[in-house]
Amino acid sequence: MAVVRLPDGSERVYEHSVTVGEVAASIGAGLARAALAGKVNGKLVDLSARIENDSDVAIITEKDAEGLEIIRHSSAHLLAHAVKELFPEAQVTIGPVIEDGFYYDFSYKRPFTPEDLAAIEKRMAEISTRNLKVERQVWDRSEAINFFKNQGEHYKAQIIEAIPGDEDVSLYSQGNFTDLCRGPHVPATSRLKVFKLMKLAGAYWRGDSHNEMLQRIYGTAWTNKDDQNAYLRRLEEAEKRDHRKLGKQLGLFHLQEEAPGMVFWHPKGWVVWQQVEQYMRDIFRNNGYLEIRTPSVLDKGLWERSGHWENFRENMFVTQAEDREFSVKPMNCPGHVQVFKQGLKSYRDLPLRLAEFGSCHRNEPSGALHGIMRVRAFTQDDAHIFCTESQVQDEAVQFIDLLQKVYNDFGFNDILVKLSTRPAKRVGSEEQWDKAEEALRSALNHKNLIWELQPGEGAFYGPKIEFSLKDSIGRIWQCGTLQLDFSMPERLGAEFVAEDNSRQIPVMLHRAILGSLERFIGILIENHAGALPLWLSPDHAVVLNISEGQADYAREVTEELRRAGIRAYADLRNEKITYKIREHSLQKLPYQIIVGDKEVAAQRVAVRTRSGSDLGQMTLPALVDRLKEEIRTRAGAA
């Protein structure tokens, strides 16, 4: 007999063991038709999973987030099935769910083409209409390895060989296609109706450039056409906002092959950079941070003591000089500990907040680079707070206040928060972890924030809070971090004199608000579609004369604006005014100041915003006041 407890608190008693699908059918025919999978005692399982004992059971449908994930995972297998039917010699490797979709990696003798992609998608639709039953079986490990080797699927055999001995080897079959997977999957291929293949890319097997380059096919899958169409519209909008395209169009920066993952900032782009950096410098200065500067190249020995050499070596740029091995720093924390160690510190000196616009380099795989969003050379608004355990909560609260102010000033008001707690492998005592997690949890609750718990997702050296922004088209960008560290201060010999004269090790809080300045500027460009708020714009205004007769007055107006601290320039070219207006509108310039004979006679200017709004004539002092107020309040784009 099995007692099944449902999410609404009701119970159902079954005389014999029962499958999840049978539970759904006993509740109602409608639920049985809608069911995709189940959750038994918190674990996702197939509808065919058998319930032998008393259990908590939930039926998963497409209305559940897990339901959509199962649809996407099953769609990845549908993709692999279609590829094997069309290209029997292709080898399948892995096909996970990703944000908004899935991908599958294949090994094949020639590159897939866009025409292949269309044919594969068509075959996926055909397989869906066959309504093939999807069945799970647990296989003997050696039999599964031999099965895939006999099929010529050597990558699958490798994957099985790497599965821990205490885990089941589960295979899923639909028609004549069998794949390795933990599951769960939809019960039949007919449940997969809304999908689209998106693009092709390359990917190394196991992410190692020494291995074969595989072909990755990306796809998306949804529960209904409306959701898919909305997603495709978002993609179109994101394409228009692509910071790489806008960076070139607006003359902000460029990248080139001779310096992969490293940005060439142009004058206009560097103005934006300086505005962001100076804003953050003021934030540091006004909130008790001491700005420092540490070396970019440090001896291998320091990286060995910090643990980076063992855990991060493959991402570090290494060089040699005078028989010594050095690394360009991938992060700033070891250098900050060295500054803390200079001179004996007392508990009265804590908390000590050290900040740096730290220039870091990481040897990211070339395939992972993406404009200025994912680079090899970047600058962080980095800071480390050295404090006692009892100070952690107050420091966390102050940091959250600061982070919210910064994000609001940059126009981001929708912030997602996640707290990651102790992983299985960790340093520090249970008491330390209890105190640290409670301090961060209390700080979040003190600020009345809605936050998500991520059990076991903390770093081995301490729990952390992650802060993500939602942009104007609904995309999520993880930027801010507050990371507690029990390990590095001890590894690098940091200590302070406590009130009882004992030597103690400080807690170290790694914290960043923007993260990488390059990436954050990329986010700003895409969030505003290139039309940055006035205070961040490379130029605030351009002065346009209608004809040669107003050139001198246009120069005077430009000089007055510059003297008032407005970033302005004059366009005195002998072109039609409509041509000049259009050209500067495409450059997303916030204000166009137009002067003709009427404006010269009245000693006024005609003002137009980049959105096309005509503000009419106004005096120059009135215009200056308007611009200064907009800059002061960091108002949105004109």
Swiss-Prot record:
Chief place of localization: cytoplasm
UniProt entry keywords in alphabetical sequence: Aminoacyl-tRNA synthetase, ATP-binding, Cytoplasm, Ligase, Metal-binding, Nucleotide-binding, Protein biosynthesis, RNA-binding, tRNA-binding, Zinc
Region (Catalytic): 242-533
Transmembrane region(s): none
Ranges of residues in domain TGS: 1-61
EC number: 6.1.1.3
InterPro entries from the UniProt entry: aa-tRNA-synt_IIb, aa-tRNA-synth_II, aa-tRNA-synth_II/BPL/LPL, Anticodon-bd, Anticodon-bd_dom_sf, Beta-grasp_dom_sf, TGS, TGS-like
Compartments reported by the entry: Cytoplasm
GO annotations of cellular component type: cytosol
Binding-site positions, Zn(2+): 333, 384, 510
GO BP annotations listed: threonyl-tRNA aminoacylation
Cofactor notes: Binds 1 zinc ion per subunit.
Keyword Aminoacyl-tRNA synthetase appears in the UniProt entry: yes
Function text: Catalyzes the attachment of threonine to tRNA(Thr) in a two-step reaction: L-threonine is first activated by ATP to form Thr-AMP and then transferred to the acceptor end of tRNA(Thr). Also edits incorrectly charged L-seryl-tRNA(Thr).
Classification via NCBIfam families: thrS (TIGR00418)
PANTHER family: THREONINE--TRNA LIGASE, CHLOROPLASTIC_MITOCHONDRIAL 2 (PTHR11451:SF44), THREONINE-TRNA LIGASE (PTHR11451)
Protein name: Threonine--tRNA ligase
Lineage: Bacteria, Pseudomonadati, Pseudomonadota, Betaproteobacteria, Nitrosomonadales
